Amino acid sequence: MPNTKPVGVAYSDPELTSGTTMTGGTLDSTTRVNSNIQTGFSMSQQGATIATTTGGTNDVFVVVPAAGVLSAARFSGVDALTANDTNFITFSIANLGTTGAGTAAMLAATDANTTKSTGGAALTANALRSLTLNGTAANLVVAAGDRLRIRATVSGTLANTVTFPVYSLTFTVA
């Protein structure tokens, strides 16, 4: 049945009721942005001070509220830390799944996710540091209820502590 209403007047099909499924429709980017359809979400979590001691692991855990794909991971701390190839921090994120038994590495296991002077980078006080995601797409997929372990591992003896570390994760939703 064609819409015979004047322009600007909404047309309502009496056959469409709550719970009706529409198929074959598409949403353009403007419609999606102006709608209430979730396209992504982010979460931040503060951890404990990263100590200077060797072999220390500093873990923070988050539970993912909805299914999605990790699209960005960032770190920020109050203190600066000089890059050093002997005394450095390595950042990692593991998806432990809903049972706690998962092992999927969500960050690349490369020097880019360290504070090494060769391949890594120093930490600037109160600045965001982008972390490099794993190149395997399947490792970035999360389900609602997945538990993620965000870890900062100290190698050597750091020049100073890094206080008020905050981790920010961004996810896209299909």
Where in the sequence are the language-model features?
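Intrinsic low-complexity, repeat-rich intrinsically disordered segments enriched
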Residues: M1-S42
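Surface-exposed, low-hydrophobicity beta-strand/loop segments enriched in small/polar/acidic residues
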Residues: N34-A174
